[in-house]
Structure formats: structure tokens, C-alpha cells
Amino acid sequence: MSTSSLGAVGVSTATAPSAGATGAPAARAHAVEVATLWRPSAPCTPRTCVDATGPARAVPLAALRLVAVLFLLIAGFVASPLGGRIPSRLIRRWCRWVVRASGVRVRIDGGAAPDGGLLLVANHVSWLDIPLLAAVRPARMLAKSEIRDWPVAGWLTARSGALFIDRDRIRALPDTVARIAEALRAGEAVTVFPEGSTWCGRAQGYFRRAAFQAALDAEVPVQPVRLHYRLAGGAPSTAAAFVGDDSLLTSVWRVTRSRDLVAEAEVREPMAPGSRPDRRSLARAAEEFVLVGTHRAEDAGPRNTVPFPAGGGSRATEQASAAPAREALTA
């Protein structure tokens, strides 16, 4: 289920806009070619990229953790209210339980994300990215429309307030960007994975631009977040990667079998409204913060991080090791 992205796409603006796409600023900014299909993908596969040779848990304990994760998925489905969106505080708590049940240690490095309308952008590696980013700030996700048809997870994704994109209908992209901008203007946070697909962490894509137009139109900050998965000793790990033809069950099992797996989110400086003149430069700057910096971080030694917050309140610092596709869950 790699939870993912709007792979924000840089659509050519040289052609005429699609019908009905002339109203909102975001719509006017996204003229598209009729025949173009946008389906970002990554060359990563479980066989070529995923290495789960680190310390492993005993099978019985891993099986218990797998059952716990599946139980939480089902419990979230059963316990969710019948009408309306699930409150963000409940989503954050539920995400925290899922991560803990999987046996992954989480560390957050950097300052708090701003309040109010905010576009969160991050590199995309795993289904764990979503609960990891919920620790930074609960947000509405941009998800590919196919997710709605997934059992349990599709229901929960829709009920969390996710914004969906139909990746087979590129004419719908301007409307998607406009809906993101509307949510941002309403003071909500929206999370996007601009690579548009999950990558193993050793290789990476590039940031597509469309979602950044929404931040420009809504005049809100962009919050880059760099995600890494490492072993407790500091070595990068691809065990959490959810790529290629990997199934969700296989990926969850690999994670629950992995011992000493650490997920890290590095919260970079927010990019203020108006700090970049257009979506191209904004996407490029965010990519520099997230993707280029990820490779640098893999060569870095230990750094100060803070533990995954258990509830509200302060976060005490502690020393921890630094850390390092399948179609994205969010388009």
C-alpha cells in the first residue's frame, strides 16, 4: 500500500487548455496535451533493490506483530465513524499504533511544521511514510483514485479526507490542483509525494511540479521533509521499501521481521510563500532539500534526533543513528 503522492507532474503548458479549465488560477496554469497519460513509475523492484539481510526477529514474534498490524487496520475500519471525516487526532494516534505494532522505531529531526495551510512534500519509499509524516503534522493525503477500491485501506484513506487523483485522466489534473489549493486556503495541511511513485531509497526520482502550483495559488508555505530508513547501527536499509510488484502483505511481513529498523523524518526549513517565482523553481528547491540531501545524509554520522511523540507535549532529544518503487499510493 505504499501510501503516496500526487506525483506532482510538470505538464507542458505549450498546448491549449482542456475544456472547462479556464476558471481557477491553478486550472489556467495546467494546459495539457490530450493524448498524454501521466503514470509515473520507478525501476525499483523487490528482487533488485530490497535487501532485508539485517537483524531479523524470530518468526513467532514477527507473526504476532503482523497480526497486530492487520488487527489495527481492521479495527480502524470498524471503529471509524459512519459519517464525515475521521478527526486528525484519532488518525495520528492510530498511525502511531500501527508503527509501534510493526516494531519500527521512529525519530523526528528538526523543528515543528507551521500551523495553518501547508503543503508537505517528501520522498516516497514505503507505506510507513504516511504514519511517519503524521508525526510531523496530520494532513490530508493526495492519493491515486484506485486506492478507493482497496479493501479496508481504501475506506480509511477516503474517510481520512484524502484528495484523489485519476491518473488516467490528465485533463482532471487542473481540477485536482484546484482542490488542493482550496484545502490549503482553508488552513489545512496536504501531503504530497512529488516523485509520484515509491523508490527504494538507493535510487530516487525527481519532483513533479503540479502540486507546487497549488501552494503558489493558495499562498501557503511548502514544508520539505526528508525520510530515511536505517538500522539502529546507522547503516541504510531498504527493508521498508514498498516497490515494484511487492504486495502489501509481503512488505508488512518484511518490516515486522526486520529487527532494529529505524524510520527517520528530517523536517527541513519551510519555504515561505513568495520565496520562489513559479512552480518549477519551487519544485526544484524542494527537491534539493529532500532528494539531494538524502544522499548526503546517508554518508553522515549520528545526529541529534527526537523520539516519535507519544501524545502532545514536549519531545526530549536523544542520540540516534542517521538514516537512507512501486506506484505511489497517492498518485
Describe the predicted segments one by one.
Residues G116-A122, A162, E188-P194:
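Generic beta-sheet signal
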Residues V152-G154, G201-P277, A285, A297-A300, ...:
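A cross-family acyltransferase "interaction/gating" segment
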Residues R47-R107, W155-S160:
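A transmembrane-helix-recognition feature enriched in membrane-embedded lipid enzymes
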Residues G116-V125, D129-V136:
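Glycine-rich active-site/cofactor-binding loop and its immediate structural neighborhood
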